[in-house]
Amino acid sequence: MLQAHTGYDLAIIGSGAGAFAAAIAARNKGRSVVMVERGTTGGTCVNVGCVPSKALLAAAEARHGAQAASRFPGIQATEPALDFPALISGKDTLVGQLRAEKYTDLAAEYGWQIVHGTATFADGPMLEVALNDGGTATVEAAHYLIATGSAPTAPHIDGLDQVDYLTSTTAMELQQLPEHLLILGGGYVGLEQAQLFARLGSRVTLAVRSRLASREEPEISAGIENIFREEGITVHTRTQLRAVRRDGEGILATLTGPDGDQQVRASHLLIATGRRSVTNGLGLERVGVKTGERGEVVVDEYLRTDNPRIWAAGDVTCHPDFVYVAAAHGTLVADNALDGAERTLDYTALPKVTFTSPAIASVGLTEAQLTEAGIAHQTRTLSLENVPRALVNRDTRGLVKLIAERGTGKLLAAHVLAEGAGDVITAATYAITAGLTVDQLARTWHPYLTMAEALKLAAQTFTSDVAKLSCCAG
């Protein structure tokens, strides 16, 4: 039986952060919305991405904290017992709660329907939907939003199709702790998963083509590599996975690095080399929507495709694949599609965080990017040995690097390796957005014994030797 859904102002494919932000904004405008979702409502972040991974990272950090407690005089380190299935069950419960509170319940509260099925564009444009419970449906709307996100992708590796490898998605579904986990990829997924499983008790080997966190400053890459090695993670830089095959209940991998080939046996292999936009099967060619090399939907600055009635938001576009970008995109599309607002977004001061411990965070361009762009600049790097909060924590691993425009002193970028780096970088984001100079940043109030004080101290290094200043001296 054919179901017909017609007369909507906005039809959305997908149900993640971008989709929900658009739907909420549209409903707040009094517009009608219908959403089509082929899988679990909520998208990547709440189901298999941000929420479950950070929940497990927090648990791993708590366990590691007990193991590392001997850095404080008078405290003896312990090794807490681990019930991995119980940990995963708790994670699943949390995910279910947040999925209900922040997604499915909101759809009911705001009043839009979620059609569960796989959507394909047809002439009109309109959507043809193969319903999950059988049958078909059609959806017609004034405007359409593609918010289908992205999915893990794997490079061509000899034998990879013959082994049961993990991705960032399936790693969150493991019911038993891996004995030895080999991870390919040194981006945020590879780094977070490496430390997560190592701190829970797995033996971890990490292989990367260049350096860890290769999109960050070299000082941060070197710092996190040293920390990983100290925690017992085996790190192979400038290394490629050439071949892999089954080996009993595990895998045998051939790695090629600076010293030639070596073989590594592991119980599990995690591929964390990147993601690809989910656009296959959408029938975009039928409605004049172009895609790029990695399948991303090509959009203009207003997030409109070549078809004036079809828009795209989030990971499915060429823009940075952060959940907060997707959410901002969704609201923007609602404004532009339904109100003709022609709003755009400024990504200049877009912060990013990798939730290792200590964490990595940055905002603005790297020093190499500024040099390539011909922007005259000056830099200062502050070791956490000069930060009171790090000293009382008895953990001075990390740094803060600030980059300022030469001549004006305007803050251009901040790069942080520290506990709480995500919170520190938020303050730096505000400073860059406000156009502050490093001198103004140095003279801005910063509470003593907070990690954010590192920003003030780093700003002071442009004119002072902070090692020779008393506490809080400005």
From Swiss-Prot:
Cofactor dependency: FAD
Reaction equation(s) it catalyzes: Hg + NADP(+) + H(+) = Hg(2+) + NADPH
Keyword annotations: Disulfide bond, FAD, Flavoprotein, Mercuric resistance, Mercury, Metal-binding, NADP, Oxidoreductase, Redox-active center
Gene Ontology annotations of biological process type: detoxification of mercury ion
UniProt KW Acetylation keyword: no
SUPFAM superfamilies: FAD/NAD(P)-binding domain, FAD/NAD-linked reductases, dimerisation (C-terminal) domain
Residues that hold FAD according to the record: 19, 39, 44, 54, 119, 315, 323
Top-level enzyme category: oxidoreductase
Residues forming coiled coils: none
Induction of synthesis: By mercuric ions. Negatively regulated by MerR.
Co-factor note (free text): Binds 1 FAD per subunit.
Enzyme Commission code: 1.16.1.1
InterPro entries: FAD/NAD-bd_sf, FAD/NAD-binding_dom, FAD/NAD-linked_Rdtase_dimer_sf, Mercury_reductase_MerA, Pyr_nuc-diS_OxRdtase, Pyr_nucl-diS_OxRdtase_dimer, Pyr_OxRdtase_I_AS
Gene3D superfamilies membership: 3.30.390.30, FAD/NAD(P)-binding domain
Chain residues that bind Hg(2+): 471-472
Keyword Secreted part of the UniProt annotation: no
Highest taxon, organism lineage: Bacteria
Disulfide bonds: 45-50
Additional observations: The active site is a redox-active disulfide bond.
Role of this protein: Resistance to Hg(2+) in bacteria appears to be governed by a specialized system which includes mercuric reductase. MerA protein is responsible for volatilizing mercury as Hg(0).
Family: Belongs to the class-I pyridine nucleotide-disulfide oxidoreductase family.
Entries under NCBIfam families matching the protein: MerA
Complex and partners: Homodimer.
Name under which the protein is recorded: Mercuric reductase
Species this protein is from: Streptomyces lividans
Gene designation per UniProt: merA
